[in-house]
From Swiss-Prot:
Record comment regarding domains: The N-terminal domain does not have lytic activity and probably modulates enzymatic activity. The C-terminal domain is the catalytic active domain.
Region (Non-LT domain): 31-269
EC number from the UniProt entry: 4.2.2.n1
Keyword set includes Cell wall biogenesis/degradation: yes
Membrane topology designation: Peripheral membrane protein
CDD domains in the cross-refs: MLTF-like, PBP2_YfhD_N
Keyword Signal found: yes
GO CC annotation: cell outer membrane
Protein name per UniProt: Membrane-bound lytic murein transglycosylase F
Summary of the function given for this chain in its UniProt record: Murein-degrading enzyme that degrades murein glycan strands and insoluble, high-molecular weight murein sacculi, with the concomitant formation of a 1,6-anhydromuramoyl product. Lytic transglycosylases (LTs) play an integral role in the metabolism of the peptidoglycan (PG) sacculus. Their lytic action creates space within the PG sacculus to allow for its expansion as well as for the insertion of various structures such as secretion systems and flagella.
An annotated Gene Ontology molecular function: peptidoglycan lytic transglycosylase activity
Native organism: Salmonella paratyphi B (strain ATCC BAA-1250 / SPB7)
Amino acid sequence: MKKLKINYLFIGILTLLLAAALWPSIPWFGKTENHIAAIQARGVLRVSTIDSPLTYSVINGKKYGLDYELAQQFANYLGVKLKVTVRQNISQLFDDLDSGNADLLAAGLVYDSARVKNYQPGPMYYSVSQQLVYRVGQYRPRSLATVNENQLTIAPGHVVVNDLQRLKETKFPDLSWKVDDKKGSTTLLEEVISGKLDYTIADSVAISLFQRVHPELAVALDVTDEQPVTWFSRLDDDNTLSAALLDFFNSINEDGSLARIEEKYLGHGDDFDYVDTRSFLRAVDNVLPELEPLFKKYAKEIDWRLLAAISYQESHWDPLATSPTGVRGLMMLTKNTAQSLGLTDRTDAEQSISGGARYLEDMMAKVPETVPEDERIWFALAAYNMGYAHMLDARSLTVKTKGNPDSWTDVKQRLPLLSQKPYYSKLTYGYARGHEAYAYVENIRKYQISLVGYLQEKEKQEAEAMKLAQDYPAVSPEELNKAPFPFLSFLSQSSGYLTHSPSLLFTPQKKEEK
């Protein structure tokens, strides 16, 4: 019996050694790879995305974007660095997953039944609808029934293609479209804006952000209902990455981080006003250049473009603006506030901007330290508009109604209640025009988004023009004449061949003499 046991032990050890040697060559070995362990061993989370105002963008060397900030937080959660790769279109994103060049796709992608057959979706964090857009002043289609491929162009890999195919089969048999393999949704939106393209389809949030900079972009109709947005990873037997994503999103949902980031990028509202936005951008071109140095000089700790947006909301950048209540100037300061700040002339542009900036800094300093850094400005602006005491009442009301007093998303929803007697009668400082403070802050945020995007667009155009000038520098006639093939000499020698008829330039000489 003892010998038999020894033989079994030997066979067992031999079997284990053989299995260990053959393990990497077993066909399903790759499927059991621990994705999280691989990411942490590499020390880098590889994320592919698309360059857009919502997902990922770089402004003055600083990175922004809803998906970028979430991806950075997830990388921190895993204890690794973040590597972002920007692709031109959705099709290229999924190519990165297929080739193993990306761990995650974080680009505002929509959950779709066709996609989840081949890729693993993550938690859903907001929703969008797909909309058909056109340029203001052009024909607006009221239905997809008459839209054809000569008018409608879609980016490759766009989820709406599946919806269009279903609509073609069930409702609109004449519906057709074209897929441009070389362009992404952002480029196609720009071509609709410029008039090069009749229609394209994009998600409602991206369109809303584009309209802040390009008010001539208009929505013709909704192509789909609301659809959830999610991240995607490879679909296999290893669920470690999916589990980590679920834990991560649960944690940022519980601590309020997700709500703050969504408020930052999605909280600007969707009540787009074409006339107001167009008027604002005209003022950016015609009025702002004179005031810009003053905004930059006195902005200090806040973004000068935010200070400029506040001033436009207050006075439309009119130094002589006066309200029925007596507030005056670019920053619409009261007489008492101006005196407390040592100002002598509220209609003087520099005094008004410097005073308004200092008053806003005072409001920010009063905001409780429990409020997150990136949301303090909104509390300060509400206090700037309706008074600090009423802002405290709004926080108190938020607590009483089971909200978070440190969350701007929660507090701003209670602002309109400050003018309703059942609520203000129970507050310390009573009645306030909370609905006006709500609109005030929301308008400033919209102007800031428009200003940042518009200035970024102008910088991009100027950079492209400069590069074009460098690649193709202007040449004077004198420089041309010094060239190996002197241009002026050629013209003088060829004058006998130049006629009013272009066709005669290439007529043989003998035929001309004949």
